[in-house]
């Protein structure tokens, strides 16, 4: 099974990234010109499929001895595996945003889901690198994140959301509300069912930029205050790129 081994920036890994990009293009081509209701049903259906796949993936982790040894010395805890992180919370935010046509939610998912999922695909933790894609732990990790990239980008390619700088304040508000909500869930779980709960990494994380933030503001939740500034800069850059692309498409051929 070595030929299916997934290591960042090696053959199978690069092929997976290529297939992810191809899936975005294929969905666009298949649904281009189709009624909005059909496009909506399709995207929501893909999201629900991914949510079911995510549930199966997490169930497989509860039976994975290597994963449990690495992350749960006191035993597996499903309450630390819920889809409430910055990336996988979009498993249900994307279909909710499409169903309600909520630009704040769709905007958040468009900007955050592909970025967060792509970072997970490009820079996996050691236990998710160098193993066969046929292992449930590896298959679930890479495929669920790849589909998140596809669904997040499809919000734009299928016409549900076009990046607009006027949306950014509302998206930042959505981000803030989700972060506070995640922290409250962390507090509740730490007092009851899951002492290590750390959704949205509100208690810090061994990630370079987050460790830097913690050194600046060593307080749970509050240490992430610089994050909205970085997110805003990223969103404004994407909006500017989108506007340039739109102008190029609208320009008459000379």
Where are the language model's segments positioned?
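Membrane-interface transmembrane-helix boundary segments in multi-pass integral membrane proteins
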Residues: 4-19, 171, 177, 192-235
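Hydrophobic core of alpha-helical transmembrane segments in multi-pass integral membrane proteins
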Residues: 14-33, 47-59, 179-183, 228-240
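Alpha-helical transmembrane segments in multipass membrane proteins, preferentially the mid-helix core
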Residues: 23-30, 93-94, 147-166
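Membrane-interface helix-boundary motifs at transmembrane edges
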Residues: 31-44, 99-107, 158-169
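Aromatic-anchored segments of alpha-helical transmembrane domains
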Residues: 50-59, 113-125, 175-187
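Juxtamembrane "helix-exit" motif on the non-cytosolic side of transmembrane helices
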Residues: 58-70, 122-132
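Membrane-proximal helix-loop-helix units in multi-pass membrane proteins
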Residues: 98-156
């Amino acid at each position: 099974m070595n030929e299916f081994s997934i290591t960042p920036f090696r053959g199978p890994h690069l092929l997976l990234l290529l297939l992810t990009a191809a899936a975005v293009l294929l969905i666009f081509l298949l649904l281009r010109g189709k009624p909005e209701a059909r496009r909506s049903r399709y995207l929501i259906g893909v999201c629900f499929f991914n949510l079911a796949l995510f549930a199966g993936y997490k169930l497989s982790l509860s039976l994975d001895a290597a994963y449990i040894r690495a992350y749960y010395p006191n035993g597996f805890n499903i309450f630390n595996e819920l889809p409430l992180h910055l990336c996988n919370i979009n498993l249900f935010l994307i279909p909710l945003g499409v169903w309600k046509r909520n630009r704040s939610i769709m905007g958040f998912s468009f900007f955050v889901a592909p970025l967060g999922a792509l970072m997970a695909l490009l820079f996996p933790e050691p236990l998710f690198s160098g193993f066969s894609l046929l292992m449930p732990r590896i298959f679930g990790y890479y495929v669920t994140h790849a589909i998140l990239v596809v669904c997040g980008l499809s919000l734009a390619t299928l016409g549900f959301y076009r990046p607009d700088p006027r949306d950014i304040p509302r998206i930042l508000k959505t981000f803030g509300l989700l972060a506070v909500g995640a922290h409250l869930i962390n507090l509740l779980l730490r007092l009851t069912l899951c002492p290590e709960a750390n959704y949205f990494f509100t208690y810090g994380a061994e990630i370079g930029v987050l460790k830097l933030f913690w050194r600046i503001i060593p307080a749970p939740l509050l240490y992430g205050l610089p994050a909205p500034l970085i997110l805003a800069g990223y969103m404004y850059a994407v909006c500017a790129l989108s506007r340039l692309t739109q102008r190029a498409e609208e320009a008459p051929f000379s």
